[in-house]
């Protein structure tokens, strides 16, 4: 499968000025930008910056960023699922994972996350994929957002809806371990019925084992 990447962008207004939401961004451009010091949800900022550059260099990898001048203040990543997870077991070339989305605290509350997802889906290539994401409450910044689990889940779900992702049932053990955890996905209009059925088998692994 060829992974065509077509650049799109949008501007959003914030209290301190305008932000550029853009992507997919090349590894070279990503490496040349500053990385906001408060983007620490997954790794220390320098390590996460390097990880984004690596993902952008993958054939299927996509990084959409929010940029204030030359500083990255938010991002969303897309790539094939981790080989250790069940979602990679079918070796589906048209199943990609929204692996991480993060916005620096100073830039929250002005639809940066929603716009990152909206710009992501502007590329016609996304209609060839099933885009999935797994949401686990232990990754959520409940303290920083001053929200309980269910309030945060509602915010997260609404943000994902902006990119066309909706809730899907699954028997995956980690997701099933807490009712706030969830699987969300968007099935592109060009995805084959065969791939949809394969995704169903991955979602309900135990049902199809017997």
Curated annotation (Swiss-Prot):
Gene3D superfamilies: 3.40.630.30
The UniProt record lists the keyword Acyltransferase: yes
Source taxonomy: Bacteria, Bacillati, Bacillota, Bacilli, Bacillales
Observed effect of gene inactivation: Does not impair growth on acetate. Disruption together with other acetoin utilization genes acuB and acuC results in poor growth and sporulation on acetoin or butanediol. Triple deletion of acuA, acuC and srtN improves the growth on acetate but it does not reach that of wild-type under low-acetate conditions.
Residue ranges of domain N-acetyltransferase in the record: 20-161
EC number: 2.3.1.-
Reported regulation of activity: Activity is sensitive to salt concentration, a high concentration of KCL (500 mM) is needed for complete inactivation.
PROSITE patterns found in the cross-reference section: GNAT
pH dependence: Optimum pH is 7.5.
Family classification: Belongs to the acetyltransferase family.
Organism: Bacillus subtilis (strain 168)
Protein name (Swiss-Prot/TrEMBL): Acetoin utilization protein AcuA
Pathway the protein acts in: Ketone degradation; acetoin degradation
Leader sequence residues: none
Temperature dependence: Optimum temperature 37 degrees Celsius. Thermostable. Retains 93, 78 and 15 % of its protein acetyltransferase activity after heating to 100 degrees Celsius for 5, 30 and 60 minutes, respectively.
UniProt cross-references to SUPFAM superfamilies, sorted A to Z: Acyl-CoA N-acyltransferases (Nat) (SSF55729)
GO MF terms, alphabetically ordered: acetoin dehydrogenase (NAD+) activity; acetyl-CoA synthetase acetyltransferase activity
Gene Ontology biological process terms in this record: acetoin catabolic process; butanediol catabolic process; carbon catabolite repression of transcription by glucose; cellular response to acetate; spore germination; sporulation resulting in formation of a cellular spore
């Amino acid at each position: 499968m060829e992974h065509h990447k077509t650049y799109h962008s949008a501007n959003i207004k914030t209290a301190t000025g305008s932000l550029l939401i853009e992507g997919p961004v090349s590894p070279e451009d990503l490496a040349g930008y500053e990385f906001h010091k408060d983007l620490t949800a997954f790794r220390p900022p320098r390590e996460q910056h390097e990880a984004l550059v690596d993902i952008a260099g993958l054939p299927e990898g996509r990084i959409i960023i929010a940029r204030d001048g030359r500083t990255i203040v938010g991002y969303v990543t897309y790539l094939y699922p981790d080989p250790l997870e069940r979602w990679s077991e079918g070796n589906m070339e048209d199943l990609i994972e929204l692996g991480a989305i993060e916005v620096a605290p100073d830039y929250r509350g002005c639809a940066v996350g929603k716009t990152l997802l909206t710009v992501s889906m502007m590329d016609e290539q996304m209609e060839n994929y099933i885009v999935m994401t797994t949401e686990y409450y232990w990754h959520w910044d409940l303290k920083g957002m001053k929200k309980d689990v269910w309030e945060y889940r509602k915010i997260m779900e609404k943000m994902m809806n902006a990119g066309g992702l909706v809730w899907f049932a699954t028997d995956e053990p980690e997701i099933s371990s807490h009712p706030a955890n969830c699987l969300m996905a968007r099935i592109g209009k060009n995805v084959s019925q065969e791939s949809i059925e394969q995704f169903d088998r991955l979602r309900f692994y135990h049902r199809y084992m017997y």
